């Protein structure tokens, strides 16, 4: 298992354009850059949508459970998103 050899993080990767951020929630090596290579996209976050919009945070809970069982640790922000569901 290739991904067991290093520390994994479930974190936000910034996309979009200047002053219009859009984030993908990804599983990546903890030493890779914020917007660098990642193993899998497990959700998305659009901070420009209203707080009650259901599309503001989209998560694939099954895949997040899988990656946490393998040893991936969510960042503080991603942990808040998961706790809200």
UniProtKB/Swiss-Prot annotation:
Family of the protein in this entry: Belongs to the bacterial ribosomal protein bS16 family.
GO biological process: translation
Matching SUPFAM superfamilies: Ribosomal protein S16
Pfam families for the chain: Ribosomal_S16
Keyword tags: Ribonucleoprotein, Ribosomal protein
InterPro entries recorded: Ribosomal_bS16, Ribosomal_bS16_CS, Ribosomal_bS16_dom_sf
Record keyword Ribosomal protein present: yes
PANTHER family: 30S RIBOSOMAL PROTEIN S16, SMALL RIBOSOMAL SUBUNIT PROTEIN BS16M
UniProt name for this protein: Small ribosomal subunit protein bS16
Molecular function GO labels: structural constituent of ribosome
Gene Ontology CC annotations of this record: cytoplasm; small ribosomal subunit
Domain of life per record: Bacteria
